[in-house]
Amino acid sequence: MRIDRLTSKLQLALSDAQSLAVGHDHPAIEPVHLLSALLEQQGGSIKPLLMQVGFDIAALRSGLNKELDALPKIQSPTGDVNLSQDLARLLNQADRLAQQKGDQFISSELVLLAAMDENTRLGKLLLGQGVSRKALENAVANLRGGEAVNDPNVEESRQALDKYTVDMTKRAEEGKLDPVIGRDDEIRRTIQVLQRRTKNNPVLIGEPGVGKTAIVEGLAQRIINGEVPDGLKDKRLLALDMGALIAGAKFRGEFEERLKAVLNELGKQEGRVILFIDELHTMVGAGKAEGAMDAGNMLKPALARGELHCVGATTLDEYRQYIEKDAALERRFQKVLVDEPSEEDTIAILRGLKERYEVHHGVSITDGAIIAAAKLSHRYITDRQLPDKAIDLIDEAASRIRMEIDSKPEELDRLDRRLIQLKIEREALKKEDDEATRKRLAKLEEDIVKLEREYADLEEIWKSEKAEVQGSAQIQQKIEQAKQEMEAARRKGDLESMARIQYQTIPDLERSLQMVDQHGKTENQLLRNKVTDEEIAEVVSKWTGIPVSKMLEGEREKLLRMEQELHRRVIGQDEAVVAVSNAVRRSRAGLADPNRPSGSFLFLGPTGVGKTELCKALAEFLFDTEEALVRIDMSEFMEKHSVARLIGAPPGYVGFEEGGYLTEAIRRKPYSVVLLDEVEKAHPDVFNILLQVLEDGRLTDSHGRTVDFRNTVVVMTSNLGSAQIQELAGDREAQRAAVMDAVNAHFRPEFINRIDEVVVFEPLAREQIAGIAEIQLGRLRKRLAERELSLELSQEALDKLIAVGFDPVYGARPLKRAIQRWIENPLAQLILAGKFAPGASISAKVEGDEIVFA
């Protein structure tokens, strides 16, 4: 008999049988070697076949091992083994069966059938399992599906659905899928399309994270619960595993062969299976080689005829990029658009998922946390979609609490480290022998005993709190399990089990949980086991960099005292501070237009009067850090072509991938103060871009992504009209009119019209310079404090600085230079000369025409 008459799987099994015989020092390959190899073969069809007809695999394996041990062994094996007569007879019998069935190749299942012979030891072992030959013949007939074996690789394409798909209905039955809350319209629309006669293939299209896969999971759960029309009852929903389909397809045509096997098996199911392809766009071009068909083209005929019930899921961008280009594939699918759920719907979804996350993490999630997750994620995480981002917040906050429970509390850790430190000190002191050391040692011993007692008490509290938390988590797990068992009993119609679980098991467990919770009602000293809105805010803060206090602090009081807060840094300029404060309050109170930036201002005035400083103060007030200030120097955008730098270079130009200077900054920090410095120096075309930002609070970059400016404060500064401000000092009305004339002459009306407020800054008066001097000196004192030095200035020294540093034309900047020249420069020399050691107090006073330090 020729070896090439065997299928590739049987050839591999024969090779494994040879290795088995050599390993056991047997003189020849026996039928028992071959059956053992077939039973252990990866991806073989024999083991599933035996399990299907009722064989006990463990008992069979044990019987085969006994047979192997009973075979004779040779003393000095050469490693050269041949087929035994029994195995040759078995293969000839299989050959005869293959000829009867019209097969060109001998397959593994025919060898198994031939082995079921009462006259052989192997046959007796197989028949001893209580399975008849007739039952095995029927199972083999089902496996072959009435087809002849005309291809050596035919066994690899069998059970293609088991190999290359995941049964979602089975997972739903086992309770492994999360509950799907809401989404009734989308599920109903999907069912409606699936019920069509032809082109019954819905494709779910939506942004990433809106719940497309969840809709299919919801459909699987409805099929299991029988909550679908008769046409879909008892159907299986299988998810195609593209990774398994492509993995290991080394040769050309192997991928197509696998996909064809899947499609053939689906065809045999006669519409009893719905195929779900997640990331549908991956089918277009998958397996594509020169002259070969891709997966999308192989699916087309089955999709058009209605033979294949298929549900796809993909994002809007990928649908446009891959599927819309292939019009023939697109027309075979029916679009079902999946929108982002509202905040209220997200809260309902989170409430439905809450139990699953509580059981997984072993913590309790409050309703406040759920509401905070929906609201904060919607407000602060703008580049992702609900409900995904809200679920992620809950998950991460719960994970954080769980991590705290599992690791040693901070207080215990601190005591532990202190104890180790004291014990090291004790060992060092034991080597000394004088009186002072003995006293110190006795004191140390006292401290160690006291700390050890404190540590033991805390450890006991920690362990009892931990046990309480874990006990509660275990009971919750049992309740979840009982609910799944009740669902399974309901589907089977086992009313007795269902009643027992519903009215006995679950109430008992809930009572136990209540007792544990009642016992743990007192506030835990060391462990937090609840996820509250504070934990959610902490996670949002980690993601976005927006301080937690800003989300939860009573903003009302903070906003009412906004002017005082800003005046700590900005001296004078009451009109500007009030204008900015009012705009922020309008926005926070919800009275401002929600589709525009929180505020947009044009700051006008001479140099050095606090225009940029007010922006920095505003960024620090709103977001707790000056880092939230996005500063763009508009003098860099003087040429027409430089406009593209703000939103990114157009496609085809160098730098397209990098994105825009302004748009990328706001995408990364959507909550910020945007400062466009020296705006009058920019090219007029820049203002065309700004119109969209000021009117709609949005800007589209060169990649087509919309950047949200609604949470920003846009401030533009300009020196226009500063000469008129100096000339008309003291006359506010005339000043403003002159400046507005200059502004109207330079900017277009549609640009000025979109700005919330044009603020004119006044030149600084002498008394205001004194306040600024205090702020500047305060910063210097802070720097000196880092070197453990303090600085005190006499009134005369301060007056001298103000006199030297006051210049109405240049504002406060000359004061900074005066402090550098008269204070910082001489101080630096004295410190480097070693005159002032750390801890020294430095006083500055005027002697003659100089400021001296002592």
From Swiss-Prot:
Task: Indicate the segments forming the Clp R domain, all copies.
Answer: 3-146
Provide the coiled-coil residue spans.
Answer: 391-524
Segments for region (Repeat 1): 6-71
Q: What main location does UniProt list? A: cytoplasm
Residue span of region NBD2: 555-763
Task: Identify the residues that bind ATP 1.
Answer: 206-213
Q: Per the UniProt entry, what are the Gene Ontology biological process annotations, in alphabetical order?
A: cellular response to heat; protein refolding
A Pfam family of the record is Clp_N
UniProt xrefs under Gene3D superfamilies: 1.10.8.60, Clp, N-terminal domain, P-loop containing nucleotide triphosphate hydrolases
Renumbered residue ranges of the record's region Linker: 341-545
Localization: Cytoplasm
One GO CC term on file: cytoplasm
* Stretch list, region NBD1: 159-340
Please give the InterPro entries that the UniProt record associates with this protein.
AAA+_ATPase (IPR003593), ATPase_AAA_core (IPR003959), Chaperonin_ClpB (IPR017730), Clp_ATPase_C (IPR019489), Clp_N_dom_sf (IPR036628), Clp_R_dom (IPR004176), ClpA/B (IPR001270), ClpA/B_CS1 (IPR018368)
Q: Which UniProt keyword terms apply here?
A: ATP-binding, Chaperone, Coiled coil, Cytoplasm, Nucleotide-binding, Repeat, Stress response
GO function term, MF aspect, one: ATP binding
Q: Where is this region: C-terminal?
A: 764-854
Binding annotation for ATP 2: 605-612
Give the function comment from the record.
Answer: Part of a stress-induced multi-chaperone system, it is involved in the recovery of the cell from heat-induced damage, in cooperation with DnaK, DnaJ and GrpE. Acts before DnaK, in the processing of protein aggregates. Protein binding stimulates the ATPase activity; ATP hydrolysis unfolds the denatured protein aggregates, which probably helps expose new hydrophobic binding sites on the surface of ClpB-bound aggregates, contributing to the solubilization and refolding of denatured protein aggregates by DnaK.
Question: How does the entry describe the domains?
Answer: The Clp repeat (R) domain probably functions as a substrate-discriminating domain, recruiting aggregated proteins to the ClpB hexamer and/or stabilizing bound proteins. The NBD2 domain is responsible for oligomerization, whereas the NBD1 domain stabilizes the hexamer probably in an ATP-dependent manner. The movement of the coiled-coil domain is essential for ClpB ability to rescue proteins from an aggregated state, probably by pulling apart large aggregated proteins, which are bound between the coiled-coils motifs of adjacent ClpB subunits in the functional hexamer.
Relate the assembly described in the record: Homohexamer. The oligomerization is ATP-dependent.
The name this protein goes by in its record: Chaperone protein ClpB
Can you name the source organism?
Answer: Pseudomonas aeruginosa (strain ATCC 15692 / DSM 22644 / CIP 104116 / JCM 14847 / LMG 12228 / 1C / PRS 101 / PAO1)
Q: What is the lineage of its organism?
A: Bacteria, Pseudomonadati, Pseudomonadota, Gammaproteobacteria, Pseudomonadales
Instruction: Give me the gene this protein comes from.
Output: clpB
